A protein has these predicted regions:
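Amphipathic beta-strand/beta-sheet edge segments enriched in Tyr/Trp
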Residues: 47, 109-176
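C-terminal/domain-edge helix-coil "capping" segments
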Residues: 43-59, 150-219
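Multi-bladed beta-propeller domains
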Residues: 104, 209-226, 253-270, 299-317, ...
Length: 457
């Protein structure tokens, strides 16, 4: 959840994608009164063909769901085969299809490592993936193979075993298929944290797999919470909680389930963000009562010494680290309205990068370093997701249509973005490729969700 404070007759206004009320009865509202108007020199649009080239790397892949004996009638095995197909499609790297029934029947009758895939070469396939899923008393076993349809050469042959959910073995196989074709790490094993509304009252911290499965509730506080920041290197999630009435930054340890307070100064302690190395966190603190402005600080989990980076007479919040750790994007109203700025990680070389409109917040720096996602206000005064280059020279709006879009965050491979989407009071997590294609909901969480965040690998 992007929060933005502006002093106006001693009242603080917050941008918030859904209606909630804190224990202290703070008024939380959207900046719907801010118009999306031209302000200063407009940036040039980002070339969509460039974005498409980033996300449009496609390989034509045949998938063969291999069966063996009674396994063919297993509902669990059929579900596992469907998940493999879905994971391959979801990756965005493959144009996946299951060949004709005749071809499948012939290929199912041969050994995984035998000859026979050449019958698919005429179909223009660049690879043939096959998997056999079996279950026994020790767990689920996935034997996955990828072959060249022309030469018949085995490109990948590996068995994946798990004593837990079958999807874990399947996700590992799909990530290996992606690496075999692209040389890039897949995201099938990636995790997403978010804040979810509880059935009766309040919110809590949740985590799930990249596809919305494997949902886990991590906290049971029933209080307002938001802005999770997840570092896999430290196995920790930093987030904002009103557990002790005031907004404090807590750190949840995924290994132990324990929480510690990172920042609990008087006033606001909000919007944490981990650096890629998992060592540093950038946060926004007011260090006083709620009428005080927030400033950006950097700290570490080890010594908890807070180094102040911003010193302007304005609100500064929502820091987002660059992949290199050398720069930080953040929100400031120093020019009168909330805009995105970038500074070096020591607080120097501050410069503004958004100029279109009066409302640009919630920056999220992409893992490749060449794009920053953020929330902009469209011409119908609805928050939408936009992209800009780090120097502000090019920008584009990538979500459209009804509803309000908020809290963008990047997949670890930089090919897609998740965000919260609200229509008619209902907020869900959506995912899309950068070119706007393959937009769909993630998960089936039955209540409102806010501030989704990918785990930083």
């Amino acid at each position: 959840m992007e929060m933005f404070l502006m002093e106006n007759n001693n009242t603080s206004f917050f941008h918030q994608p859904i209606r909630v009320v804190s224990p202290l009865s703070l008024v939380l509202i959207l900046f719907t009164t801010l118009f999306f108007m031209s302000h200063g020199e407009k940036a040039n649009a980002i070339d969509l063909s460039v974005i498409s080239n980033q996300t449009g790397l496609m390989f034509k892949l045949a998938y063969i769901p291999l069966t063996q004996g009674a396994v063919a009638s297993s509902k669990a095995t059929k579900k596992a085969q469907d998940l493999i197909f879905r994971d391959l499609v979801e990756s965005g790297y493959f144009d996946v299809s299951i060949p004709s029934n005749e071809a499948v029947s012939k290929l199912q009758a041969i050994s995984l490592t035998g000859e026979g895939t050449s019958m698919l070469a005429s179909g223009g396939y660049e690879g043939v993936a096959a998997a056999r899923v079996t279950e026994d008393g020790t767990g689920t076993h996935v034997l996955g193979v990828v072959r060249d349809p022309v030469s018949g050469k085995v490109l990948l042959s590996r068995e994946y075993t798990t004593s837990g959910a079958a999807r874990h073995a399947i996700h590992r196989f799909v990530d290996d298929v992606i690496f075999q074709f692209t040389g890039l790490k897949g995201i099938a094993m990636a995790k997403i944290a978010f804040i979810g509304k509880n059935p009766r009252r309040g919110y809590d911290l949740y985590a799930m797999d990249f596809d919305g499965e494997g949902l886990h509730r991590l906290t049971f506080d029933h209080v307002l919470a938001y802005s999770p920041a997840w570092s896999l290197k430290t196995h920790q999630i930093a987030y904002v909680s009103y557990l002790h009435m005031d907004p404090q930054i807590l750190v949840y340890d995924l290994r132990t389930g324990r929480r510690t307070a990172l920042a609990r100064f008087p006033g606001l302690n909000i919007t944490p963000d981990f650096s890629r190395d998992g060592i540093h966190l950038a946060v926004a603190l007011s260090k006083g009562n709620r009428s005080q402005r927030t400033e950006i600080y950097v700290t570490t989990l080890k010594d908890k010494t807070f180094n102040r980076l911003t010193f302007s007479r304005s609100n500064n919040l929502s820091p987002s680290w660059s992949p290199s750790g050398n720069q930080i994007a953040f929100v400031s109203d120093r020019d009168g309205h909330p805009q995105i700025f970038v500074m070096d990680s020591d607080g120097t070389n501050v410069h503004r990068i958004t100029y279109n409109g009066f409302y640009n917040v919630s920056p999220a720096w992409g893992p490749s370093g060449d794009l920053v996602a953020f929330v902009c206000m469209n011409d119908r005064h609805r928050p939408k997701i936009c992209l800009t280059t780090p120097d502000g020279s090019r920008s584009i709006q990538i979500t459209h249509g009804r509803g309000q879009d908020d809290s963008p965050d990047w997949s670890p491979d930089g090919r897609s973005i998740i965000y919260s989407h609200q229509v008619r009071g209902k907020s869900v997590i959506m995912k899309m490729f950068l070119d706007g294609s393959h937009t769909h909901r993630i998960g089936t969480f039955p209540r409102d969700v806010i501030t989704p965040m990918w785990a930083i690998p």
